[in-house]
């Protein structure tokens, strides 16, 4: 019996989601579109296998081919980022972070990381996250004038806090991060340096953003976002920390790995090792700069930090008298998918927010050009400006449909 006949409800929901992706412009910075090969690996018979442990040291039999796949993923990750050690088993970036904290820290240890409202992540010490509940996090923010990292100020905070670990990396920061300066700060106070490069991993792989691996003791990342792989996590580190990281992940916080996802990671890492991936990553940056130029023409929109060095930009939308949630919902109506996002000095709270975050990874995968990316930025401005004009919004939606029709998902 085929899928549709066996379970029409689930099949229908998946079909509808496929249609949504096909006919919407995806600008959520943490999302991308995987290749057919990655999807094939993730939908393979490897989903049937259980393989607690690591290659050559499993708690179940019949893992000889699973070992081949996992070793390929490990070797490719190490080669791609120049790492001494890689663990490809984390189910997510959050679990990669949890395992890393447990490998390096004791409960209650002090950690210095980026504040969530200034661009950090929940797992960087938010009180609603395990990280903020198990460890004593202190936070650095952005310079209120430049809305960029102030390394001198971070150094001062590190001197005051004397943390066991410093975390560099962000989920909503549009400027390049200087990991060498973070290494110097960590050395100055005798702290471990952890880098969470989940958003920029693809740019790092392509040589278009500073690589944190030579500077950090440990680097965590997701394998989706700009890396264009399956949803999952990855840990890279100095060889001396490998045993502790492996133990912290399994049996520490996970049981068996998701072998079908590990296979998809291996495929995606192999794709990222190809010369064409650097061209793709450069197009992500080119498209973002073009989109920024479209936003800059609108005096009612303010770009946080004035622009972008990577695949994303944060936009303060309050100049229009609206909040981020309202803009997110409005853009959904015209077929443009974004997410509301807090901005530095947030006044509206996390559920309404003052801004939105947009990224160009997914539209670049679809083949959008720089001119089309600029036009998308202009359409966003037009939709907000004409939010009470339904005929105008309908016309914008038609243009969105025309753009997506030029660039089918596959």
From Swiss-Prot:
Its EC number is 2.1.2.1. One of its GO terms (molecular function) is pyridoxal phosphate binding. Its main location: cytoplasm. The keyword Cytoplasm applies. It is found in: Cytoplasm. GO terms for cellular component: cytosol. The record marks 224 as: Plays an important role in substrate specificity. Its cofactor is pyridoxal 5'-phosphate. It catalyses: (6R)-5,10-methylene-5,6,7,8-tetrahydrofolate + glycine + H2O = (6S)-5,6,7,8-tetrahydrofolate + L-serine. Transmembrane segments: none annotated. Keywords: Amino-acid biosynthesis, Cytoplasm, One-carbon metabolism, Pyridoxal phosphate, Transferase. The modification N6-(pyridoxal phosphate)lysine is found at residue 225. Pfam families: SHMT. (6S)-5,6,7,8-tetrahydrofolate binds at residues 116, 120-122. GO terms for biological process: glycine biosynthetic process from serine; tetrahydrofolate interconversion. Belongs to the SHMT family. PANTHER family: SERINE HYDROXYMETHYLTRANSFERASE (PTHR11680), SERINE HYDROXYMETHYLTRANSFERASE 1 (PTHR11680:SF35). NCBIfam families: PRK00011.1. Catalyzes the reversible interconversion of serine and glycine with tetrahydrofolate (THF) serving as the one-carbon carrier. This reaction serves as the major source of one-carbon groups required for the biosynthesis of purines, thymidylate, methionine, and other important biomolecules. Also exhibits THF-independent aldolase activity toward beta-hydroxyamino acids, producing glycine and aldehydes, via a retro-aldol mechanism. Homodimer. HAMAP family: SHMT. This is Serine hydroxymethyltransferase. It comes from Lacticaseibacillus paracasei (strain ATCC 334 / BCRC 17002 / CCUG 31169 / CIP 107868 / KCTC 3260 / NRRL B-441) (Lactobacillus paracasei). The lineage of its organism: Bacteria, Bacillati, Bacillota, Bacilli, Lactobacillales.
